[in-house]
């Protein structure tokens, strides 16, 4: 909301940075909090949480697609939604019947967290996943706008609606991924989703200039799979990590993962400027799901994996 009150670019950037900081402070505690309500079905529970975040992230694209609304109304609408969420949590949400021991974050415990090979591999998988996820979300609107122009569809609202659909369908993906993770296994689910999303990153350039139905189909499949596995990495940490260090482990995993997103979000427009086109920029994202898949397949073969998803690995 501060963006509406300032005229200085520096202050606007500051408010954007603070938005990111406070979002980061919400995410790890919310994952830990919802985990205290579930011993079985935890993957679905965390998947539903990440799915709601995904739908919330997609919502501004829908608001933006309504052409007569200015960007100011987009900011106001999303701010109202955020404050409503805070009010609901403050009044109705509390810790569940399966709490973790209370232990403050401690830098000295980071080494202990990563001495756990299962947590380490789950985190590497998450890092690969994050290399792809937020860059896709951040630049898919620009990619689709440029692609639509190539297809003689010069309508920014159409690209915004498409981006809303491509990102928003990830909410359903998170729920499906949670169900698959609980029933079929988390390492198998994450590996499958990263294989599909990585393939979509590879194929995006080939459908850039049509046909339109292939571009739309790829966008929806990519949006569904790119985030469907997101909650499963954190769920694995809650299952394999020392209960005393779960909060620290989640914070470290998420913190490093979000730092990696800065790299790919920064790289993609540089690549587009260098190539003078957005057609092939998503190739930069492929190493993420490739490395992440390898990490999860290694984890699947470890004896500790029997603790994941009640033995479903």
Language-model-derived ranges and their functions:
Residues 15-51:
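Cytoplasmic helix-loop-helix junction between adjacent transmembrane helices
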Residues 80-99, 292-300:
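C-terminal membrane-cytosol helix-exit motif in multi-pass small-molecule transporters
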Residues 169, 181-236:
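C-terminal transmembrane helical hairpin of 12-TM major facilitator-type secondary transporters
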Residues 240-275:
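A late C-terminal transmembrane helix in Major Facilitator Superfamily
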Residues 40, 48-93:
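Helix-loop-helix hairpin linking two adjacent transmembrane segments in secondary transporters
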Residues 25-38, 228-242:
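Intracellular juxtamembrane helix-capping segments at the cytosolic ends
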Residues 118-171, 234, 264-265:
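Extracytoplasmic gate region of multi-pass secondary transporters
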Residues 90-112, 305-312:
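Flexible cytoplasmic inter-helical loops of multi-pass small-molecule transporters
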């Amino acid at each position: 909301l501060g963006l509406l009150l300032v005229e200085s670019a520096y202050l606007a950037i500051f408010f954007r940075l603070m938005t990111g900081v406070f979002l980061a402070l919400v995410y790890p505690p919310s994952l830990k909090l919802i985990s205290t309500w579930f011993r079985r079905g935890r993957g679905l529970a965390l998947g539903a949480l990440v799915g709601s975040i995904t739908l919330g992230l997609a919502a501004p694209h829908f608001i933006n697609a309504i052409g007569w609304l200015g960007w100011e109304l987009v900011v106001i609408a999303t701010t109202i939604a955020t404050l409503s969420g805070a009010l609901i949590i403050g009044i109705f949400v509390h810790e569940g019947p399966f709490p973790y021991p209370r232990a403050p974050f401690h830098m000295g415990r980071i080494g202990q967290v990563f001495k756990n090979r299962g947590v380490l591999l789950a985190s590497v998988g998450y890092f690969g996943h994050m290399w792809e996820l937020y860059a896709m979300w951040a630049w898919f609107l620009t990619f689709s706008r440029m692609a639509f122009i190539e297809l003689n569809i010069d309508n920014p609202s159409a690209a915004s609606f498409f981006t809303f659909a491509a990102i928003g369908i990830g909410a359903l993906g998170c729920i499906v991924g949670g169900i698959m993770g609980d029933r079929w296994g988390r390492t198998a689910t994450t590996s499958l989703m990263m294989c599909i999303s990585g393939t979509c990153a590879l194929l995006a350039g080939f459908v850039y200039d049509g046909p339109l139905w292939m571009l739309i189909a790829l966008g929806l499949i990519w949006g569904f799979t790119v985030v469907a596995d997101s909650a499963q990495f954190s769920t694995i940490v809650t299952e394999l990590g020392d209960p005393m260090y779960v909060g620290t482990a989640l914070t470290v995993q998420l913190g490093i993962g979000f730092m990696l997103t800065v790299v790919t979000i920064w790289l993609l427009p540089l690549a587009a400027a260098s190539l003078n086109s957005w057609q092939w920029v998503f190739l930069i994202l492929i190493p993420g799901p490739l490395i992440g898949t390898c990490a999860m397949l290694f984890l699947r073969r470890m004896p500790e994996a029997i603790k994941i998803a009640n033995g479903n690995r």
